[in-house]
Amino acid sequence: MKKLLIVIGLLFIVVWGYAQKPNYERMANTVMDKVVVESKFTTKKGLKWTYDLGVPLEGVFEVWRTTANETYFSFVKKWMDKYIDKEGNILNYSAEEYNIDHVKNGKVLLALFKATNDKRYLNACHRLFAQMQSHPRTNEGGFWHKKIYPNQMWLDGLYMAQPFLSEYADLMQKPELYDDIVNQFVWMEKNAKDAKTGLLYHGWDESRKERWSNSKTGLSPHFWGRGMGWFVFALVDVLDYFPSSHPGHNKIVAILQRTIKAVAKYQDPKTGVWYDVVDLADREGNYLEASASSMFTYAMAKGVRQGFLDKKYLKSIKKAHAGLVNEFVEEVSPTHINLNKVVAVSGLGGTKNYRDGSFEYYMSEPVVANDPKGVGPFMLADIEFERLKNQSAMSKSTHVILDNNSNTESKDSKKLLDNFQERISSARVSANAY
């Protein structure tokens, strides 16, 4: 009987291991079943146009590109089609709000246009671009975070708009946009960077009128993890479509290098991940946070893979990826996982329950499982880690041997990626014909 139980146990382990999908795919399944559901995006006015939708959908779209499983593509398209009508109008979107968060979903729309050549998605992107053409700015030219937050630049805002604008400029052949894209990062770093740590403060108020802002510097009090995460996320994604021949390209790379150097110093040596308030690991109440840790892992892995960051970070990346799994991932089944310890939201100011940017404020926000702002970056970080690992293996040997948990790119997936690149080329032609 004892031997039989041992055999059954071993068979269970083998079957579980054989059936288990890569973590990015298991996370995508959780997103489709539990995260991106209508009940979470429906308000009294109907479906809400929010970056909380675009962040996980971008992750699911990349899972489609990696696996060639049409289920993931269909899910992304189905959700965007709830918002985009036949003319490319966006449901419950108001450009006049001048909310930079609302531009983020344009990345998903651009991806769908390239995949389908359906001009509805491109027309919707034109509307988002039009918002940014008249979006309020600081005196030197930085985009306000929102009209209701005048004179303020937040780290979050760089992620919400600049990757979209970079890809839009590439698609629509608008090289005149690149200088402005570079300057947004230059100004953010100049105004928000701490000389001692190299980290960037969450927000900067040019007017110095906000209660959270320092009367001399205009800066918020702390280095928020996900804010820093949004910033490095934006840097590596902007570079996807930013021409290397442009003089601003090296400026973006240099900002990425400086910022990652600073972030790497605060990686928790025990777990490999990062704290919610990055530099205060020993402060009572501070906690290891999943979304920021996923974003840092993603930016480091992608930066090294694309040659923008030194390979000296490989050890940190490996430790960070292991930390994501060990510290935050909860096993559900061979096809699903949960992502724990994601801060639901953190901001600055406002009219109700004013957010003063204090340490106590950041610690007061709820920490949840499977928040959209965590699961999206986690999928992308997991994919980037596998791509980097495969690239490293290829550079060492023409005969690639990966461990059982690695995703080896299938012929179907390779064909899909090649076809997608062809679609991008044809999309440029189509885009400029509309």
Residue ranges, per PLM feature:
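Bacterial Sec-dependent N-terminal signal peptides
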Residues: 1-22, 425-434
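Alpha-helical scaffold segments in carbohydrate-active enzymes
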Residues: 30, 34, 59-62, 82, ...
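Oxyanion-binding "anion nests"
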Residues: 232-281, 285
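Asp-box/WD-like beta-propeller blade repeats and closely related beta-sheet repeat scaffolds
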Residues: 121-160
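Inter-helical turn/loop segments and adjacent helix faces that build the functional surface
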Residues: 67, 168-179, 238-250, 303-311
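Loop-centered beta-sheet repeat module
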Residues: 178-239
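Carbohydrate-binding/catalytic loop surfaces
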Residues: 58-61, 99-112, 143-157, 198-223, ...
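CBM-like carbohydrate-recognition segments
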Residues: 22-54, 66-73, 82-100, 106-108, ...
